[in-house]
């Protein structure tokens, strides 16, 4: 079979026309220095701030410093295998984390990778970890309560959905316990909880996860953990990863609670990164933008307007103080960003008053408008009474002959302190809180010996559950107090059957 010359030429033409050359242009750079979670690379002229970069061994990095001749990269993973002279290439993607309901019940690292040994997570969506906070017109004022189940907080320092309430105190004063109790109390509240552990011991995080699992709270909780053994970039990114996961739910009209435990360690990690990147240090060696580090995170907590779906993110950031010094740099920064603070005092904690809330220094700037009417009515004077008692208590140590009014205030104060004590992991529904505070503020407990107050409380709750369930149901469903006569009659009836220990 002979092939004609014109056939050969047409075949060659066809081949040339159908030939496709896949030329990939990649922007690459060279590592010139590496160490302590930081790499310095030459090249990569067109890189974006915050862009993900890939090293030759597959480890990812994030562009942080953009300079004239080189870029500073924070390494998101083990950096021991990255060498001077290695290639680093652009991905064209901004740092993102996986989001969605598939994450509920799981423990992940700040990159959204599972670390609980329960296999991969099949998410379908992701969100950038840095995103703009909702604007003024997209927000609505805080008006729905977030019940923590902790008497001293729900009565005196109430928190609303969409609020940012700082929890501040020395180490070992019960900050994490407040977080866990608040998560446990959201069981039937249709609230998604995100617990971000920053720089905690792995054993501590495991304990928190186990507590949540045993009490059925892990089903509506995501745990994001950057432990103390992780490199500084992971600790720096963890809070942003947590709030991005929360935003996915918020923009779909759901309510989210995000707990950052704690932001002092994030600030320390950011200081470490900044100093390694040769950024100029400021007060306490923190970089100049450490305020912006926290403000851009906490401004993403909001109560959205109805037009945007009415979802919310409530933020509970933690700050650890040194010897109760709330006037240090990071504490004052975060106090000025948030809508109030709950101050936990170590001497109250050690004297057996737990939760160790200092009512005088704690404040909630917007939570009052979110309280239910019944709670507002019964707890109105509670904070002032407690603050007055603290003053009188110090004063009364010097003199024994006190007038009747002062003695009555001291007696009421002692009973108030006892009522506000609460056991660990024992959150209380709001209707029971209203009932016991009503009994306290209306003077029904003034004749109960101080040592019997807690027994009075538990027996009173049992009595209400069995005999006066309608009163509790009324508070829960309507948010209002029952008729005064009915409530008083119920308390009087219970007191007849209550026997004091002395």
From Swiss-Prot:
Region (Disordered): 119-139
Record EC number: 7.1.2.2
Keywords: ATP synthesis, ATP-binding, Cell membrane, CF(1), Hydrogen ion transport, Ion transport, Membrane, Nucleotide-binding, Translocase, Transport
Entries under Pfam families matching the protein: ATP-synt_ab (PF00006), ATP-synt_ab_C (PF00306), ATP-synt_ab_N (PF02874)
Residues annotated as binding ATP: 169-176
Domain of life: Bacteria
Keyword Phosphoprotein set for record: no
Top EC class, one word: translocase
Coiled-coil annotated spans: none
Similarity annotation: Belongs to the ATPase alpha/beta chains family.
Self-association state and partner proteins as the record states: F-type ATPases have 2 components, CF(1) - the catalytic core - and CF(0) - the membrane proton channel. CF(1) has five subunits: alpha(3), beta(3), gamma(1), delta(1), epsilon(1). CF(0) has three main subunits: a(1), b(2) and c(9-12). The alpha and beta chains form an alternating ring which encloses part of the gamma chain. CF(1) is attached to CF(0) by a central stalk formed by the gamma and epsilon chains, while a peripheral stalk is formed by the delta and b chains.
NCBIfam families registered for this protein in UniProt: atpA, PRK13343.1
HAMAP family found in the cross-reference section: ATP_synth_alpha_bact
Protein name: ATP synthase subunit alpha
UniProt organism field: Alkalihalophilus pseudofirmus (strain ATCC BAA-2126 / JCM 17055 / OF4)
Biological classification of the source: Bacteria, Bacillati, Bacillota, Bacilli, Bacillales
Name of encoding gene: atpA
């Amino acid at each position: 079979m002979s092939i004609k010359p014109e056939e050969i030429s047409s075949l060659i033409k066809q081949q040339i026309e159908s030939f496709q050359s896949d030329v990939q242009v990649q922007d690459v750079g060279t590592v010139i220095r590496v160490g302590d979670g930081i790499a310095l690379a030459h090249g990569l002229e067109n890189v974006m701030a915050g862009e993900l970069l890939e090293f030759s061994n597959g480890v990812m990095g994030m562009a942080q410093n953009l300079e004239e001749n080189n870029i500073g990269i924070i390494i998101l993973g083990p950096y021991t295998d990255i060498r001077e002279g290695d290639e680093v290439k652009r991905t064209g993607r901004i740092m993102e984390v996986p989001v969605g309901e598939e994450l509920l019940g799981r423990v992940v690292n700040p990159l959204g990778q599972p670390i609980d040994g329960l296999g991969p997570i099949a998410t379908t969506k992701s969100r950038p970890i840095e995103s703009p906070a909702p604007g003024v017109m997209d927000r609505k004022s805080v008006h729905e309560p977030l019940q923590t189940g902790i008497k001293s907080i729900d009565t005196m320092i109430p928190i609303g959905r969409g609020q940012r309430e700082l929890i501040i105190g020395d180490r070992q004063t019960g900050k994490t316990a407040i977080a866990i109790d608040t998560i446990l109390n959201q069981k039937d509240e249709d609230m998604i909880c995100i617990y971000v552990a920053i720089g905690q011991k792995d054993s501590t995080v495991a304990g928190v996860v186990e507590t949540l699992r045993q009490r059925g709270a892990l089903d509506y909780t995501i745990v994001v953990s950057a432990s103390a053994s992780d490199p500084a970039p992971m600790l720096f990114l963890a809070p942003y990863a947590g709030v991005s996961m929360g935003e996915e739910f918020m923009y779909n009209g759901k309510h989210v609670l995000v707990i950052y435990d704690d932001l002092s360690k994030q600030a320390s990690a950011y200081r470490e990164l900044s100093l390694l990147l040769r950024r100029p240090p400021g007060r306490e060696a923190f970089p100049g933008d450490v305020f912006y580090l926290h403000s851009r995170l906490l401004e993403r907590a909001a109560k959205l307007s109805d037009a945007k779906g009415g979802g919310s993110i409530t933020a509970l950031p933690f700050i650890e103080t040194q010897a109760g010094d709330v006037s240090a740099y990071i504490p004052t920064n975060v106090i000025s960003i948030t809508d109030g603070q709950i101050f936990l005092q170590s001497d109250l904690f050690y004297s057996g008053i737990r939760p160790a809330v200092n009512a005088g220094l704690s404040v909630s700037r917007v939570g009052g408008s979110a309280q239910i009417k019944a709670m507002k009515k019964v707890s109105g004077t509670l904070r002032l009474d407690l603050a007055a008692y603290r003053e009188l208590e110090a004063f009364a140590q010097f003199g024994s002959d006190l007038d009747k009014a002062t003695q009555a205030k001291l007696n009421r104060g002692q009973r108030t302190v006892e009522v506000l004590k609460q056991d660990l992991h024992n959150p209380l529904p709001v209707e029971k809180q209203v009932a016991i505070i009503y009994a306290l503020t209306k003077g029904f407990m003034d004749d109960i010996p101080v040592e019997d107050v807690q027994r009075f409380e538990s027996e009173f709750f049992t009595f209400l559950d069995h005999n006066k369930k309608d009163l509790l149901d009324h508070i829960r469903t309507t948010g209002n107090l029952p008729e005064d006569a009915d409530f008083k009659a119920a308390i009087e009836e219970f007191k007849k059957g209550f026997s004091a220990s002395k």
